[in-house]
A protein has these predicted regions:
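Short, basic alpha-helical/linker "hinge" immediately adjacent to a nucleic-acid-recognition surface
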Residues: 1-4, 10, 30-85
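Mobile genetic element proteins and their domesticated derivatives, centered on retroelements
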Residues: 19, 33, 44-47, 55, ...
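Residues that mark the N-terminal boundary/hinge immediately upstream of a DNA-recognition element
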Residues: 28-29, 92
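Basic, flexible linker segments flanking DNA-binding modules
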Residues: 55-154, 222-230, 308-310
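Mobile-element integrase/transposase regions
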Residues: 75-76, 86, 106, 118-176, ...
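Acidic/histidine-rich, metal-coordinating catalytic segments
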Residues: 197-227, 249-252, 308
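Charged alpha-helix within mobile-element recombinases
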Residues: 228, 234-305, 309
Length: 310
């Protein structure tokens, strides 16, 4: 009997069996049993009655072996997995759960979707262990430092031309501004920065890599050497006239926030553009106008200090 109980009972239930037996054998009072199990004497009496009627099995959870009332109906699971296979096969569980709710009215947690996919042998989304990195503390104020970079990628997945996403991410808040261009160069840099200014104002500093668009590759002239200044690109001169400091990043790791943004966008944004049917630069940029406010509302953070230094 005990062996059978042990198969179907939890450790907590087995402990109750032992204590209730001791109580029925008058080795413990009901008050003492209640103290041991953390239950009231009234509850102890109910357990004693249950054992008297059904034996030790009466202390097993009454819902064990029965389907949970909270269990998601099988037809919902089937529909969700069918939609995933048909439309979202390369999506991770989080984005898939968002789209199932947003586009099909099927509300599921990401962990539920993850579990269903793993049970079906779908594992492409498994998280990989990230290499350890030394985190640089964020700036305290919005507008104090903005990271800028361009990402060359097949953003439209062959539906349109390859293009470059010029992205600005505020260091203090992770707020993002971005726009697609045909190439990464002076004109796209100037145009995107002008649009950034019109939207948010002039930041104190821009942090960009050593691409020739941002930092001149020319050797300093004798006059520049004597003056202790570096040659500047056209973009660098424009920032200088606005009083914006242009800080060079010497490695991709130094631009950690914008590099991580591109990894996120190369997963999420590409799929969102696919669902929206974007196939031209104009369509992609119109999509960004609606997408970025939603993205920023979800993923930006509260800066340490409330003042905006733009």
């Amino acid at each position: 009997m005990v062996g059978e109980d042990r198969v179907i009972m939890s450790v907590k239930e087995l402990r109750r069996v032992h204590v209730i037996r001791q109580t029925r054998e008058k080795k413990l009072t009901q008050v003492q049993a209640g103290i041991v199990l953390g239950l009231t004497p009234r509850h102890i009496r109910r357990l004693i009655e249950r054992v008297a009627q059904a034996g030790d099995q009466g202390l097993a959870h009454r819902g064990r072996g029965k389907p949970s009332n909270r269990r998601i109906p099988e037809k919902v699971q089937t529909k969700a997995l069918t939609l995933y296979a048909q439309r979202y096969g390369d999506f991770g569980p989080t984005l898939a759960a968002e789209k199932l709710a947003e586009r099909h009215g099927i509300t599921l947690s990401a962990e539920t979707v993850r579990g269903w996919l793993l049970a079906k042998g779908v594992t492409h989304f498994q998280r990989r262990k990230r290499p350890h990195r030394a985190w640089r503390e964020r700036k305290a104020h919005v507008g104090e430092l903005v990271q800028l970079d361009g990402s060359h990628h097949d953003w439209l997945e062959g539906r349109g031309p390859r293009c470059v996403l010029m992205a600005y991410i505020d260091d203090a808040s992770s707020r993002v501004y971005a726009r697609f261009y045909a190439y990464e160069g002076t004109i796209p840099a100037m145009d995107s920065f002008q649009r950034y200014i019109q939207r948010y104002g002039i930041p104190l500093a821009i942090y960009a890599d050593k691409h020739s668009t941002y930092h001149s590759p020319a050797e300093p002239t004798v006059a520049e050497q004597l003056a202790g200044v570096e040659p500047r690109s056209q973009f660098g001169r424009a920032l200088g006239e606005l009083g914006v400091e242009l800080i060079p990043a010497h490695s991709p790791q130094a631009k950690g926030r914008v590099e991580r943004l591109f990894k996120t966008f190369q997963d999420r944004l590409i799929k969102e553009l696919r669902l929206a049917g974007g196939s031209t630069l104009d369509e992609a940029n119109r999509f960004l106008e609606d997408y970025l406010p939603i993205y920023n509302q979800r993923f930006s953070v509260q800066p340490v200090q409330p003042a905006d230094l733009h």
